[in-house]
């Protein structure tokens, strides 16, 4: 009787072992599956939360053809933060200036919302190699060597595409800040975008204004022009912002390139005309000169710089022509950050000149950089 009563218990143990063993095997298999596939999917979702399985996910492993297919809509969705993006348009020779600008933006914690509009494929691949997803090319690609020469047709072709790029972003539903890359951020410009205006911009004048100057659109001068700079613009995705960009596009199209003109056309006069044509329909805000000075004021008027110490937000290296001259002036004023602070940029250290040594322009740029690094000249102290 005792033996018979123990058999069911023994059988029950065996049954439980078999069942538990099966469960353990299933759990082990599940852990193996999760261990292999979950990190891949999780890292993809963590790094690129704005992408979907049906869209192109930015990744350093993407092929050249993939980056060619990367669209503006995908790029803006990837980089946007709080429905806002910061954009610039860059050709390959100006990558060092892009890196310098990015370092200054990184110091203000806004680098992740930056989108580089590459004007040539070399720029597209280089930026996305270092910083996947943060560069997009909107065809057609431009000649990288002629696009950086101020006053050239290549430069005009580059800048004349700008309002259409900005309009496209606005129509996607995003606010956008545009910067030229020969700028340096010293403070956070978003702190100065007060109110609910459609467009914010900076003056390009060297004449000193009072600290409490008007923030309205400047009136036309006696010659019928104003000097608002198209180098730094913030636009909200409003009907007014879109209208301003559409009008700017129309004004540029009305002044096609003509090499015989005494003053070759560029985008800034067209922007000023667009501002005045839409003055009754677009709410605009002129940023304070003390915070957003032109290069003609900041680099040439030491007295004014000292009087406005601590107020400067973005410095524009304009009122000077030439790649090497711009770099030299940044170096003289301790605003060339690339040599000593490259690791603060999302792009890190860029080795780009060796790739251009097969061209005459590439060799010239290499000589410029070597010369500037060897002889920095006397440095001015920042106020």
From Swiss-Prot:
Entry function: Catalyzes the transfer of D-xylose from UDP-alpha-D-xylose onto L-fucose. Probably involved in the biosynthesis of rhamnogalacturonan II (RG-II) through xylosylation of the internal fucose moiety of the A-chain of RG-II, a structurally complex pectic polysaccharide of the primary cell wall. RG-II is essential for the cell wall integrity of rapidly growing tissues such as roots and pollen tube growth and elongation.
Tissue specificity remark: Expressed around trichome support cells in the adaxial epidermis of rosette leaves, in cauline leaves, petals and both the proximal and distal ends of siliques.
Note on domains (UniProt): The conserved DXD motif is involved in enzyme activity.
Annotated glycan sites: 50, 82, 157, 212, 258, 301, 306, 357, 364
E.C. no: 2.4.2.-
One annotated GO biological process: cell wall organization
Main enzyme class: transferase
Cytoplasmic topological intervals: 1-20
Record note on modification: Glycosylated.
Primary location: Golgi
Gene Ontology CC: Golgi membrane
Cellular compartment(s): Golgi apparatus membrane
Protein's gene: RGXT3
Protein family according to the UniProt entry: Belongs to the glycosyltransferase 77 family.
Protein name: UDP-D-xylose:L-fucose alpha-1,3-D-xylosyltransferase 3
Membrane topology classification: Single-pass type II membrane protein
Residue intervals on the Lumenal side: 42-383
GO terms for MF: UDP-xylosyltransferase activity
Cofactors: Mn(2+); Mg(2+)
Source organism, top-level taxon: Eukaryota
Transmembrane segments: 21-41
InterPro entries the UniProt entry points to: Nucl-diP-sugar_transferase, Nucleotide-diphossugar_trans, UDP-D-xylose:L-fucose_XylT
Keywords: Cell wall biogenesis/degradation, Glycoprotein, Glycosyltransferase, Golgi apparatus, Membrane, Signal-anchor, Transferase, Transmembrane, Transmembrane helix
UniProt motif (DXD motif) ranges: 180-182
